[in-house]
């Protein structure tokens, strides 16, 4: 009798708990569906947001963790309008809320202050009005806050100064008013974070507040002119906007500089100023390091600390005085008069490109003889090293991680092309330049080191930069680079991810195979040997349909004509499952009627196998 009574109670308890669990599991889905109902979606990007599905992790533009909690909502540049909803505050585990470049209006819900795990809040380039919620000061893990290019009004909440993790702040191009806070995390931000808010005043701007004494913004640091010695003729250009006071001071005490010069070790080829005369200079969170700091960090650029070598110079592992690990890129370039100004300008541009999937520039060092860039150290190396140089004791990249790398790197490149002004063309997209952070999230590195692309014009270079096997045919033959140059390199990188092979490998000649990875892949596809393409390290632990989809994206990206390649923003959408089937079907129809595409011979590259061979509408679907 007692056992029967317990059984009855157990059944009743289950009837109570199961609905409660369903409600809890579906809370995030309900919150996102509320957002969908408040948004106008002309392109149907939210079509997969089905409220009948308990788990929103199956929806496009939504990313979940292993516990099926929503950690990312990515709806940037989706032509959405409407308003946000307070229910967004129920996404307790959300880390990234990306709603930039839409037409969303109304106020920013104060409930966003409940998202205490939020790392990045990107609402820029919308039509938001009203004040910045004071509750955003609760987001103590927030690193990126970009609310620029809206119509926000009122004062800047002082609560934001308590967010010590804040690295990037952009409130520019709004209607904010009052005094800019200057304490806490705000002490490191420059006027560029608050530009084009006519009613703002205070030290964070160039305008003093009423009743306050006038002030002059601090001038940018002006590097000293090196001491002249026999056989030396180096000189430096002035930094734009700098003043000559610092240089004049140094010339007033030449004995100090000369004494320092005499104390240098004969084998050193550096020129630096004493640490006490090289104050820290911050551009937002960008630090200017002294050369001595980086010499100490890298053990005087010891060969044992070399992480890699590339077309731009060597990269050294270093440990700063605070114990943090960094990667120091020591650039090799010819010194030209005025080069300091150009270098600082490019450094500032690179530092403004901040995205989860871009390698963040931590600082720089500039002397008359040295140019160095300081980045966070990526402990998991590059995709190339993980594919082909991993120790036997470490597991290979699994298929799920490779898919994440494909999507993350696409998002990073899309940001460089569509959200940087001027846009940044990478020009050397390859597996070796896709780094992996501690969570194996893709981080695009080495961007901005080539000449920056002007917003409107195609950049023509006298020297083609890039790596054999990754260079787009039109770039190799004409020297003209564009976003589509990067798209081609990205497509080759996808093939590296799928196959584990190098983009150019003479070893394939031993089997009478093509040395170019793209041609090798196309040859196997013509023979319908898809299983031969996949990296053996995966040991068949992959999903066939996902491999096919990734190959389709790679082939679309590596078409011979740059005009026929998708933009990186389109690539992101295709990887998220939006529009790939239609684009692939369209491509197949064109290939059926198209004759063999012949490009003109590449300049100085007769040995290169043409990578634009017709695939005759290769089928990548159906049973095998």
UniProtKB/Swiss-Prot annotation:
Membrane topology according to the record: Single-pass membrane protein
Signal peptide positions (record): 1-25
Induction of synthesis: Induced by benzothiadiazole (BTH) and infection with an incompatible strain of the blast fungus Magnaporthe oryzae.
Keyword Transmembrane found: yes
Glycosylation sites: 103, 114, 127, 149, 175
This protein's record includes keyword Iron-sulfur: no
PROSITE patterns reported for this sequence: PROTEIN_KINASE_ATP, PROTEIN_KINASE_DOM, PROTEIN_KINASE_ST
EC number: 2.7.11.1
Purpose: LRR receptor kinase involved in defense response. Does not seem to be required specifically for XA21-mediated immunity or basal resistance to Xanthomonas oryzae pv. oryzae (Xoo), or immunity to Magnaporthe oryzae. Involved in brassinosteroid (BR) signaling pathway. Acts as a coreceptor of BRI1. Forms at the plasma membrane a receptor complex with BRI1 which is activated in response to brassinolide. Phosphorylates BRI1. Required for normal plant growth and leaf development. Possesses kinase activity in vitro.
Protein name: LRR receptor kinase BAK1
């Amino acid at each position: 009798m007692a056992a029967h009574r317990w059984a009855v109670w157990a059944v009743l308890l289950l009837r109570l708990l199961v609905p409660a669990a369903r409600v809890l599991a579906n809370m995030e889905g309900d919150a996102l569906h509320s957002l969908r109902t408040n948004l106008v979606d002309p392109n149907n990007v939210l079509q997969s947001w089905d409220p009948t599905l308990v788990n929103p992790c199956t929806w496009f533009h939504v990313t979940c963790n292993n516990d099926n909690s929503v950690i990312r909502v990515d709806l940037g540049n989706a032509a959405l309008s409407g308003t946000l909803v307070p229910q967004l505050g129920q996404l307790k585990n959300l880390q990234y809320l990306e709603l930039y470049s839409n037409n969303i209006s109304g106020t920013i819900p104060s409930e966003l202050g409940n998202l205490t795990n939020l790392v990045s809040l990107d609402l820029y380039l919308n039509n938001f009005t009203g004040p910045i919620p004071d509750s955003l000061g609760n987001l103590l893990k927030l690193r990126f806050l970009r609310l620029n290019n809206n119509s926000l009004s009122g004062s800047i909440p002082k609560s934001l100064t308590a967010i010590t993790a804040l690295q990037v702040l952009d409130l520019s191009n709004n209607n904010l008013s009052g005094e800019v806070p200057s304490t806490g995390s705000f002490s490191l931000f420059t006027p560029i974070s608050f530009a084009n808010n006519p009613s703002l005043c205070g030290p964070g701007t160039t305008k003093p507040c009423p009743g306050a004494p006038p002030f002059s913004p601090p001038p940018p640091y002006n590097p000293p002119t090196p001491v002249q010695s026999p056989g030396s003729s180096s000189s430096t250009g002035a930094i734009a906007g700098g003043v000559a006071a610092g240089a004049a001071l140094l010339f007033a005490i030449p004995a100090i500089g000369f004494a320092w010069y005499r104390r240098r070790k004969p084998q050193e080829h550096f020129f630096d100023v004493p640490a006490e005369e090289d104050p820290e200079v911050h551009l937002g969170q960008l630090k200017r390091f002294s050369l001595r700091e980086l010499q100490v960090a890298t053990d005087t650029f010891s060969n044992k600390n070399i992480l890699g070598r590339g077309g731009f110079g060597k990269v050294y592992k270093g440990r700063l005085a605070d114990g943090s690990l960094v990667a120091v890129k020591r650039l090799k370039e010819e010194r030209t008069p005025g080069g300091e100004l150009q270098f600082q300008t490019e450094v500032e541009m690179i530092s403004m490109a901040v995205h989860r999937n871009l390698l963040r520039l931590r600082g720089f060092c500039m002397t008359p003889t040295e140019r160095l860039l300081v980045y966070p150290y990526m402990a998991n190396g590059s995709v190339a090293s993980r594919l082909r140089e991993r120790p036997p004791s470490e597991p290979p990249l699994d298929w799920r991680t490779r898919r994440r790398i494909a999507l993350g790197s696409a998002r990073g490149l899309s940001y460089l092309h569509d959200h940087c002004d001027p846009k940044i063309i990478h020009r050397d997209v390859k597996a070796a330049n896709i780094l992996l952070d501690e969570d194996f999230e893709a981080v695009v590195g080495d961007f901005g080191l080539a000449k920056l692309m002007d917003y409107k014009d195609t950049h023509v270079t006298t020297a083609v930069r890039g790596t054999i096997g990754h260079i787009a045919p039109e770039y190799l033959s004409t020297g003209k680079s564009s976003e589509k140059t990067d798209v081609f390199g990205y497509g080759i990188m996808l093939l590296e991810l799928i196959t584990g092979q190098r983009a150019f490998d003479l070893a394939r000649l031993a089997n009478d195979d093509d040395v170019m990875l793209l041609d090798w892949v196309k040859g196997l596809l013509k023979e319908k040997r898809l299983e031969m393409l996949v990296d053996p390290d995966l040991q068949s632990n992959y999903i066939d349909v996902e491999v096919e989809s990734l190959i389709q994206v790679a082939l679309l990206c590596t078409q011979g004509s740059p005009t026929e390649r998708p933009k990186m923003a389109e690539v992101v959408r295709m990887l998220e499952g939006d529009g790939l089937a239609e684009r692939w079907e369209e491509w197949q129809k064109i290939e059926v009627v198209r004759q063999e595409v012949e490009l003109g011979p590449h300049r100085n590259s007769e040995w290169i196998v043409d990578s634009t061979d017709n695939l005759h509408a290769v089928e990548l679907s159906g049973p095998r």
